[in-house]
A protein has these predicted regions:
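Short, glycine-/Ser/Thr-/acidic-enriched flexible segments
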Residues: 22, 64, 113, 131, ...
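Donor nucleotide-activated moiety binding/catalytic core segment of transferases
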Residues: 68-109
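Leloir-type glycosyltransferase catalytic cores
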Residues: 137-225
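Short, well-ordered coil/turn elements that cap or connect secondary structure elements
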Residues: 52, 83-85, 119
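Class I S-adenosyl-L-methionine
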Residues: 66, 130, 193-194
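Short, hinge-like loop/turn segments at secondary-structure boundaries
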Residues: 75-77, 125-126, 143-144
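A donor-sugar binding/catalytic signature common to diverse glycosyltransferases
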Residues: 92-138
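Conserved catalytic-core segment of nucleotide-activated headgroup transferases in glycan assembly
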Residues: 1-74
Length: 225
């Protein structure tokens, strides 16, 4: 297993693939995969056959993975069989935003890392269903096979993404997270405010922003973007 600091010493272009937890309901319910290894096998096989030979693949484990599945050994063995072991790097450390920033694009199932990549104007390929898997923002089946993405990654339409992001922030998200005391406190407080509001799904202060964003979003969708 290599470290992120060592990987950065090379100037070769690379794609970034963040792993998700096997217990993630987004994987179990909204993707064609049951096990994360199945997705890894698809990505490695496609990369071996269709990516430019000078291109590398950086795979990062999920920071909350419990280690019961040895993804490092699985990736090593599979990459060796495909003859691309020297082009595939698996890490468990390092900054995800930095990995996105240096990449040519991001391949994933449906991780929220996709939103981080769109924020950085990076091409994103989704192998599963996701709220952000929208034509003009990402590439995916049935329009674009993964085999094509390696050589023709497309950056997201930023006006479309900004409109999508405003709607998402106003109607679907609350501040906070599930992984820290501060994050949980913020999430509870913001959720209570959302439920107590007479407009549960649309707070009055956000109404004007959302309507403007919907108009922008519709404008781009009319042109098939």
């Amino acid at each position: 297993m290599e470290r992120w600091a060592d990987f950065q010493k090379s100037d070769d272009p690379y794609f970034f693939y963040p792993l998700q937890l096997v217990s993630d309901s987004q994987v179990q319910l909204y993707s064609p995969y049951v096990r994360v290894q199945e997705a890894i096998a698809d990505v490695l096989t496609s990369f071996a056959l269709h990516a430019h030979p000078k291109t590398r693949l950086l795979i990062k484990n999920h920071p909350l993975d419990n280690g019961l599945i040895n993804y490092g050994e699985f990736i090593k063995g599979f990459a060796e069989e495909l003859g691309i072991y020297d082009r595939v790097t698996y890490v468990e450390d390092g900054s995800t935003p930095d990995m996105i920033a240096g990449s040519r694009g991001v391949v994933l199932i449906n991780s929220t890392v996709g939103l981080m990549a769109l924020d950085q104007d990076k091409p994103v390929y989704c192998m599963g269903r996701s709220i952000y898997n929208i034509e003009g923002l990402t590439q995916s089946l049935p329009t674009t096979p993964l085999d094509v993405f390696w050589c023709a990654p497309k950056a997201p339409n930023q006006p479309l993404y900004r409109a999508f992001k405003r709607i998402l922030n106003a109607q679907a998200l609350v501040h906070g997270n599930f992984y820290s005391a501060q994050g949980i406190s913020l999430a509870v407080a913001d959720s209570v405010r959302r439920f107590e509001d007479s407009h549960v799904h649309l707070q009055p202060k956000h109404r004007q922003i959302v309507m403007r964003s919907r108009d922008e979003f519709s404008k781009y969708r009319k042109f098939g973007i």
